[in-house]
């Protein structure tokens, strides 16, 4: 009988650990929803790959500086704020500037 209660406690502990691990952010690919596109008031065409690339720039910038509002400020106005440009510079994306500007035009219709 004692062994059964130990096994039950162990199973409960494992279940708790698994559920806690599921609640943590993972290193899985960044999932971008169409809802985010409209929340940012982007007026262009929703393309998940392009939107994810632009969003990833803001995510990387946030990870670099760890400023709480930076991610939101970077994405504001469909990636057209000076914060987004500052993030591009901080991440040394000079050689991709034209391509990124075209992406912003595509999703944002500036």
Curated annotation (Swiss-Prot):
One of its GO terms (molecular function) is neuropeptide hormone activity. GO terms for cellular component: extracellular region. The gene is CHHL. Keywords: Amidation, Cleavage on pair of basic residues, Disulfide bond, Hormone, Neuropeptide, Secreted, Signal. Residues 24-35 form a propeptide. Residues 1-23 form the signal peptide. GO terms for biological process: circadian rhythm; neuropeptide signaling pathway. Gene3D superfamilies: Crustacean CHH/MIH/GIH neurohormone (1.10.2010.10). The modification Valine amide is found at residue 107. Pfam families: Crust_neurohorm (PF01147). Belongs to the arthropod CHH/MIH/GIH/VIH hormone family. It is found in: Secreted. The keyword Disulfide bond applies. PROSITE patterns: CHH_MIH_GIH. InterPro entries: Crust_neurhormone_CS (IPR018251), Crust_neurohorm (IPR031098), Crust_neurohorm_sf (IPR035957), Hyperglycemic (IPR001166). This is CHH-like protein. Disulfide bonds join 42-78, 58-74, 61-87. The lineage of its organism: Eukaryota, Metazoa, Ecdysozoa, Arthropoda, Hexapoda.
């Amino acid at each position: 009988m004692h062994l059964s209660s130990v096994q039950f406690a162990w199973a409960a502990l494992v279940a708790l650990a698994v559920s806690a691990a599921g609640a943590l952010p993972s290193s899985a690919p960044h999932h971008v929803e169409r809802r985010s596109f409209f929340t940012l008031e982007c007026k262009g065409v929703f393309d998940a790959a392009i939107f994810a690339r632009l969003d990833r720039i803001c995510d990387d910038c946030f990870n670099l500086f760890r400023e709480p509002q930076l991610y939101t400020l970077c994405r504001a106005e469909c990636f057209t704020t000076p914060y987004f440009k500052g993030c591009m510079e901080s991440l040394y994306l000079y050689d991709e500037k034209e391509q990124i500007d075209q992406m912003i035009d595509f999703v944002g219709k500036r």
